[in-house]
Regions:
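Residues that scaffold the ATP/ADP-binding catalytic core of kinase and kinase-like folds
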Residues: 16, 58, 178
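Acidic active-site catalytic centers that drive phospho-/nucleotidyl reactions
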Residues: 8-10, 51, 126, 130
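Gly/Ser/Thr-rich helix-start
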Residues: 12, 55, 59, 126, ...
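Active-site neighborhood of HAD-like aspartate-dependent phosphohydrolases
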Residues: 1-47
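A short alpha-helix capping/helix-coil boundary motif
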Residues: 12-16, 51-53, 85-88, 108-111
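Substrate-recognition element of Asp-dependent hydrolases with the DxDx(T/V) motif
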Residues: 32, 36-69, 82-95, 134
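Asp-based, Mg2+/Mn2+-dependent phosphohydrolase catalytic module
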Residues: 3, 63, 67-84, 92-123, ...
Length: 183
């Protein structure tokens, strides 16, 4: 079985531009390639799980999303980094699907397809829904404060959360180093 780090996309590995509608608008956050490369070098599968309701809303198509993900993979490859898989939910939040985070269907699909042991894996994201999904899966969870909708302005406010993360990091590189130190 493999261990994995499940990463949110917008606000965690890429700048959150409120519905990234074109590949030209996609921008990796600083040090993300280093973080992803570090995880892979330490034996982790790196899997992106992202909610993309802009498809259901008609803001962009699945073809456009594929172009955005191609750009992401290309930019990572320029730094000798790569993700092992990308899974996305195209549904509107009101549809009630099981694949939209904090739902766990995409995580289970990835775990099955990549022989991932969820108990030895991590979920990293910038929103409480990422933490909730990780907790439901039995993964360790890390909140990064790089997203504009991050639920905290300081780590202390998470103490009262019903499902606080296992760790709060300022960015993905710090999160990756914490994961490696604690795995």
């Amino acid at each position: 079985m493999n261990k994995a780090v499940f990463l949110d996309r917008d606000g965690t590995i890429a700048r959150d531009v409120h519905y990234c509608r074109r590949a030209e608008d996609f921008e990796l956050l600083p040090a993300v390639p280093d973080a992803i490369r570090l995880l892979a070098q330490n034996g982790f599968k790196v899997v992106v799980i992202t909610n993309q309701s802009g498809i259901a809303r008609g803001y962009f198509t699945e073809e456009t999303l594929a172009q955005i993900h191609d750009k992401m993979r290309s930019e990572l490859a320029q730094h000798d980094a790569r993700v092992d898989a990308i899974y996305y939910c195209p549904h509107h939040p009101d549809e009630g699907c099981s694949c939209r985070k904090p739902g766990t269907a995409l995580f289970y699909k990835a775990a099955g397809e990549h022989r991932i042991d969820l108990q030895s894996s991590y979920v990293v994201g910038d929103m409480q829904m990422d933490i909730d999904a990780g907790k439901a899966l039995g993964c360790k969870t890390l909140l990064v404060t790089t997203g504009p909708q991050s639920p905290i302005s300081s780590p202390r406010s998470l103490v009262s959360s019903p499902e606080p993360p296992d760790h709060v990091a300022p960015d993905l590189l710090h999160a990756s180093k914490w994961i490696i130190d604690h795995s």
